[in-house]
C-alpha cells in the first residue's frame, strides 16, 4: 500500500484540523520529550513545528503525535517521537555537518537534520517510502538529497559523512561505515544482537583503539530491523 495513498477514515472519526495538530505537537513536546531529558532547544522547537502527520497514511494522521511507532509499509515504521528525539540529540548534530540517514523512510528525521542546518543525504531502498519522503521534504526541507539503494551499502557517491544515522535497528555495524565516515565522525542508531532488546548506541573512531569504533551504549528501545542489514555484511565493534 502506498503510504500517501488516500485512505478512508473509520466511520465516525474525522481528521483533526491544523490548529488541533499544532496543539498535538505542543503536547508531544511538553508531555513526552521535555520530561524525558530532551534538552536541546533546537530539537524541541523543530518538533513543535514539523508536521509529522504528513509522514504516515491519512488514516493514522490522528495518531501521529502519540507515544508509539506507526506502521508505514510491511516491516517499516515511523519511530515514536521520543525515540527520534533521543537519538537525534545523541548524534550531537552541528550545522554544516554532512549526515547520511540510512533507512530514511518518509523523511521525518532527514527533514529534522536539514532544519538543524546539516547537509543531508537520505538513503532508502523502498520506492513508495521515497515518494512520500521526497514530497514531505520538498515542502519542509528541500535541501535533502534522496538516494535509492540497498541500505547495507551506504552511499559512497556522496561520502564522506560526519554522521551516519540509522533510522531503525541493525544487527551489526555494516562494513561501509568504516569507508564512508570521516576520521572524526559519529554513528548513531539501534543495535540488536542475539535475543536481547535493541539498544541505542553512539560510535566514534578513536586513534589507538583496538577496534574500528569505540561504542557507547545509550538506552534500550524497540524498533524493527532495517532491510538488508544481515550480520554477514558487517564487522564487530
Q: Locations of the language-model features?
A:
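Short, surface-exposed secondary-structure junctions/capping segments
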Residues: 227-237
Amino acid at each position: 500500500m502506498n503510504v500517501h495513498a488516500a485512505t478512508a477514515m473509520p466511520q465516525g472519526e474525522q481528521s483533526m484540523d491544523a490548529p488541533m495538530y499544532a496543539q498535538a505537537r505542543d503536547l508531544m513536546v511538553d508531555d513526552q520529550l521535555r520530561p524525558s531529558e530532551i534538552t536541546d532547544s533546537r530539537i524541541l522547537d523543530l518538533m513543535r513545528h514539523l508536521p509529522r502527520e504528513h509522514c504516515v497514511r491519512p488514516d493514522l494522521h490522528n495518531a501521529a503525535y502519540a507515544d508509539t511507532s506507526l506502521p508505514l509499509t510491511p516491516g517499516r515504521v515511523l519511530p515514536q517521537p521520543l525515540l527520534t528525539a533521543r537519538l537525534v540529540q545523541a548524534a550531537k548534530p552541528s550545522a554544516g555537518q554532512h549526515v547520511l540517514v540510512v533507512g530514511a523512510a518518509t523523511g521525518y528525521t532527514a527533514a529534522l537534520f536539514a532544519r538543524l542546518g546539516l547537509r543531508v543525504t537520505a538513503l532508502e531502498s523502498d520506492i513508495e517510502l521515497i515518494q512520500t519522503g521526497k514530497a514531505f521534504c520538498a515542502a519542509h526541507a528541500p535541501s535533502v538529497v534522496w538516494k535509492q539503494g540497498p541500505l547495507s551499502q551506504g552511499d559512497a557517491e556522496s561520502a564522506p559523512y560526519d554522521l551516519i544515522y540509522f533510522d531503525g535497528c541493525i544487527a551489526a555495524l555494516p562494513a561501509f561505515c568504516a569507508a564512508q565516515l570521516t576520521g572524526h565522525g559519529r554513528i548513531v542508531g539501534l543495535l540488536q544482537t542475539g535475543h536481547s532488546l535493541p539498544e541505542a548506541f553512539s560510535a566514534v573512531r578513536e586513534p589507538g583503539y583496538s577496534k574500528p569504533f569505540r561504542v557507547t551504549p545509550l538506552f534500550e528501545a524497540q524498533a524493527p530491523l532495517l532491510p538488508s542489514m544481515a550480520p554477514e555484511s558487517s564487522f564487530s565493534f
